[in-house]
Amino acid sequence: ASPXENYQXYVILNL
């Protein structure tokens, strides 16, 4: 699980 692949879900949670 790379940060780049998990960035999309992480960004949504940060929004």
Curated annotation (Swiss-Prot):
GO MF: carbohydrate binding
Keyword Nuclease: no
Tissue-level expression: Stored in spherulous cells in the sponge tissue.
Keywords carried by this UniProt record: Lectin
Function: Possesses D-galactose binding specificity.
Record text on subunit structure and interactions: Homodimer.
Name the UniProt record assigns to this protein: Lectin-3
Organism of provenance: Axinella polypoides (Yellow-orange branching sponge)
